[in-house]
């Protein structure tokens, strides 16, 4: 449960219709095994103590009492289990029969939640036996315990307040206004659905989409436990399709008829963080009763996959579609700005590296969208002390293949003159030596844009902005930054996508060579004609920094949790030892805080994903904020591992 992780499971035990004793034994067997695995929330299907397909037998007092006896037996047997358990049964309350979910924990009955929407169409006739539940909460006596009964119930863990459980049953989710919507608005971060959804052609896909979409709409974790083998097959079959979703993603799922269970860890902290940033998600708890319970705060072993590249879809088809969409977004943003400014040219500094390559590809797309010639893009290469033959050649070939206008401006003499003006020794390879070149390049581009009636297109990406890896008022500045919302790990895939769809073999080849070129600002003199300044040797691997960036900005997690996630995500990568992960995480926080002043005055640029650093939009941070708390948490983490 540390860091907000909750190990949860949805079960579909094999049962016997109307055999409550047998069914309770099946539930307990799965519960005991789950408890050994550290499961803290276990959800079983609708009517799992009786079977869903009892029909008019539900009206028999013998079956009703059998279900209560089974529940009482389960309460006694689970006294020592550190798990919240949900089971389904019929319950007679004040002369009316309800389809209910009972919530158990450590031998205590926490509450009873009746079903709100009773299906009475097609193969379902629940209104024949049952009464819809009411939002009004009342107290009833069940198994000798006084418990709350009603749909407006929430269950909160004292040891992990971010774990707040809401309950609904089967048809409730399929209705136009599910009770889970109100549960989430009242504070529930996890929804449990006890279901008996029969299987028909196409229903599994619909069910999967329904669960995923509801978890996305409610910013919650969603467990769906459905009836399976053992239900009567007189008119229907039940496949035991169990699902666990979180914020729109299916984390765990059983194949229909597999006879297994779904199990994973839900991140309750993340749900809390998502809701904190979403101001349209109002907290409305009026009329709700919250029941608190205790669980041992043990550390949860993570089995869920932690994606090491959260900005990049793993599936090739999805990735290709994502790349095309992003390129269109970038191009449309630039096209609008060129059109509005009546710009005659789009001026881009081309280095032969990844970022300027992507910006050039976007600019060509923008001109095509405006029905203008690619020649209206003016690509400028400005070789100086650190430029290598490889990058210079690639820049020229790329421009030729794209059909853009090309100009070379050798800036070495201009830089030397500038150094003479300020008294900089050319042999001293310090920050002034590096930044002086970057600022001269920006000066050339800005004035060239003025002369040609154009706009300077910025090339810096999101990862560089996060780390401050840009010269203030140098490559940091432009008139429109097309890459400002694109992290470095995604830049690579965008260029690769353009290579795979290239119109000519020469364009394909040069794009692949650019991809193969080490990332470098080329501000220090080359050694034997090769790049001497490798960015990732200086600031760290971009795949690590993009991982950290995602969880810092998208989720608001602290250093300790991000470090834990990184260890899980990069497990098996020999180059990423714990010490390496820690080193670059600390570096990330130090640079992120220290370099905010550069982000406070960013040029305009399009947002393309959920993480961005625009000071006018998603990220508003003072330039002089202190990183002390974050670095102190990292220091404590280091001490704890020693």
Give each language-model segment a name.
Residues 1-347, 365-374, 401, 406:
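Enzyme catalytic cores with a strong preference for nitrogen-chemistry domains
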Residues 23, 161-163, 219-220, 232, ...:
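ATP/NTP-dependent adenylation/nucleotidyl-transfer catalytic domains that generate, transfer
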């Amino acid at each position: 449960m540390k860091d907000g992780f909750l190990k949860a499971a949805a079960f579909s035990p094999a049962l016997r219709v109307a055999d409550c004793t047998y069914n309770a034994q099946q539930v307990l067997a799965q519960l005991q095994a789950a408890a050994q695995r550290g499961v803290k929330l276990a959800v079983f299907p609708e009517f799992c103590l009786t079977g869903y397909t009892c029909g008019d037998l539900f009206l028999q007092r013998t079956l009703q009492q059998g279900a209560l006896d089974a529940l009482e037996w389960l309460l006694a047997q689970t006294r020592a289990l550190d798990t919240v358990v949900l089971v389904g049964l019929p319950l007679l309350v004040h002369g009316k029969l309800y389809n209910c979910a009972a919530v158990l924990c450590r031998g205590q009955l926490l509450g009873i939640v009746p079903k709100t929407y009773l299906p009475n169409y097609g193969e379902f006739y629940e209104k024949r036996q049952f009464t819809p539940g009411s939002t009004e909460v009342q107290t009833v006596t069940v198994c000798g315990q006084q418990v709350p009964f009603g749909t407006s119930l929430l269950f909160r863990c004292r040891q992990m307040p971010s774990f707040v459980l809401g309950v609904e049953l089967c048809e409730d989710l399929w209705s136009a206004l599910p009770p889970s919507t109100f549960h989430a608005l009242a504070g529930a971060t996890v929804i449990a659905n006890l279901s008996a959804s029969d299987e028909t052609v196409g229903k599994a896909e619909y069910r999967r989409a329904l669960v995923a979409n509801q978890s996305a709409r409610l910013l919650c974790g969603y467990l769906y436990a459905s009836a399976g083998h053992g239900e009567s097959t007189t008119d229907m079959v039940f496949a035991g399709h169990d699902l666990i979703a979180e914020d729109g993603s299916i984390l765990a799922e059983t194949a229909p008829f597999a006879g297994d269970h779904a199990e994973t860890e839900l991140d309750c902290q993340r749900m809390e963080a998502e809701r904190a940033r979403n101001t349209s998600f109002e907290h409305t708890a009026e009329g709700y009763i919250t029941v608190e319970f205790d669980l041992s705060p043990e550390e949860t072993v993570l089995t869920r996959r932690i994606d090491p590249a959260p900005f990049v879809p793993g599936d090739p088809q999805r990735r290709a579609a994502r790349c095309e969409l992003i390129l269109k977004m970038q191009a449309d943003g630039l096209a609008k700005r060129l059109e509005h400014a009546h710009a005659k040219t789009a001026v881009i500094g081309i280095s032969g590296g990844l970022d300027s390559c992507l910006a050039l590809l976007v600019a060509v797309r923008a001109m095509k969208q405006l029905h203008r010639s690619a020649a209206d893009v003016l690509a400028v290469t400005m070789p100086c002390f650190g430029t290598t033959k490889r990058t210079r050649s690639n820049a020229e070939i790329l421009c030729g293949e794209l059909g853009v206008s090309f100009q070379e401006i050798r800036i070495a003499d201009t830089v030397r003159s500038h150094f003479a003006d300020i008294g900089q020794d050319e042999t001293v390879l310090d920050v002034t030596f590096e930044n002086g070149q970057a600022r001269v390049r920006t000066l050339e581009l800005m004035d060239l844009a003025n002369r040609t009636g154009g706009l300077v297109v910025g090339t810096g990406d999101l990862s560089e902005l996060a780390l401050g890896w840009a010269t203030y008022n140098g490559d940091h500045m432009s008139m429109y930054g097309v890459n400002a919302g694109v992290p470095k790990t995604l830049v690579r895939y965008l260029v690769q996508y353009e290579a795979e769809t290239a119109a000519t073999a020469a364009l394909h080849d040069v794009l692949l060579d650019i991809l193969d070129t080490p990332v470098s600002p080329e501000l220090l003199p080359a050694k034997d004609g090769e790049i001497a300044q490798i960015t990732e040797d200086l600031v760290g691997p971009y795949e690590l920094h993009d991982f950290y960036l995602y969880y810092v900005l998208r989720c608001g997690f602290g250093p300790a949790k991000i470090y834990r996630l990184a260890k899980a995500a990069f497990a098996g990568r020999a180059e990423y030892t714990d010490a390496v992960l820690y080193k670059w995480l600390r570096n990330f926080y130090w640079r992120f805080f220290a370099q905010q002043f550069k982000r406070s005055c960013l040029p305009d640029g399009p947002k393309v994903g959920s993480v961005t650093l625009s000071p006018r939009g998603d990220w508003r941070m003072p330039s002089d904020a202190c990183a002390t708390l974050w670095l102190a948490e990292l220091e404590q983490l280091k001490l704890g591992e020693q």
